[in-house]
A protein has these predicted regions:
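Active-/binding-site microenvironments in catalytic and ligand-binding cores
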Residues: 1-297
Length: 297
């Protein structure tokens, strides 16, 4: 099948308008309401906090064409060589960052993926893409998130140290996980242990399969994520259908995805349910945003 035929086939499989409305841009996050936030906070008993975000620097694992560069700017010191401004000698240091938000621990906006030339709610790339960013489904419209979270520790369930590239997390691995609409379900595969070996980390990945994607969507899960650089097994279940798992979630169902999570401590302590707080910068027109989510128990 040619690229054009693929695009035509994708367009023929209508997944729009969204059940939340033809103009909806929030997808399953519509389920996260005041009641859901109170439900999440009720899980906090000890005050223990787990930081699920990775440190960003120039060594972050990235594929060609993506990078992170930070340059220190000491403009104030250059302009004020005599010791600073005012009698108190105030001075300051700032930095400039050049990077894509599609690296490190980040939240994908619903504008990130498409099926053919159509994305969430049927909007075409022409509808979405502008010169400086997307016109719709930008991450600036994604609310800050507080919801109930679940952790699926797959290595613990299978009695292994970690999963390997192409290993598929199946619905059977979700036994005992009972999300309700608006919940978040995160996956620990152990792959994140390779984070500091960029070449090894990017050399494939394990992850939830297509059956799990449909399982999450059927239950109204608002957010999911994994300790891997994408979401879903690489190599994929079907070699002819790469990155189909996040495509199902993001494009067809409006389920948000977080990548490059650090779930090791959460898994090591046996935490399975928690309050998840995920905040992000409101970057107009961006397809994603860096985040450092926290789990509270």
């Amino acid at each position: 099948m040619t690229t054009a035929e693929n695009g035509a086939a994708a367009a023929a499989e209508r997944w729009w308008p969204s059940p939340f409305g033809a103009d909806d841009e929030l997808g399953m996050l519509n389920h996260v309401d005041d009641g859901k936030r109170l439900e999440a906070l009720a899980l906090v008993r000890r005050g223990r906090m787990y930081d699920l975000g990775r440190v960003l620097d120039e060594h972050v694992p990235v594929f060609p064409g993506r990078f992170f560069r930070q340059t220190l700017v000491t403009t104030a010191h250059h302009a004020n060589p005599d010791g600073g401004v005012g009698d108190n000698g105030v001075n300051w240091i700032t930095e400039q960052v050049t990077a894509t938000h599609q690296l490190g621990t980040h939240l994908d906006a619903l504008s990130h993926l498409q099926s053919g030339d159509r994305g969430y709610n049927g909007w075409t790339v022409a509808d979405l893409a502008g010169t400086a960013g997307v016109r719709r489904l930008g991450v600036e419209g994604v609310p800050q998130i507080l919801t109930r979270g679940w952790l699926v520790d797959v290595p613990a369930r299978r009695g292994v140290e970690r999963l390997e590239p192409g290993d598929v997390v199946g619905v059977e691995d979700l036994a005992g996980v009972e999300p309700t609409p608006g919940d978040a379900v995160l996956f620990h595969t152990g792959w994140g242990a390779r984070w500091h070996d960029a070449e090894g980390y990017l050399d494939g990945e394990p992850g939830p399969g297509c059956a799990v994607a449909h399982w999450l969507a059927e239950r109204g899960v608002a957010l999911t994520g994994c300790d891997t650089w994408s979401f879903g097994p690489v190599p994929p279940e079907d070699p002819a259908r790469p990155f189909e798992v996040p495509q199902i979630l993001n494009v067809r169902h409006g389920v948000f995805v977080v990548e490059n999570l650090d779930t090791a401590a959460l898994a090591a302590d046996g935490v399975r349910a928690f309050a998840l707080l995920l905040t992000h910068a409101r970057l107009r027109g961006a397809t994603g945003a860096w985040t450092s989510p926290i789990a509270l128990v």
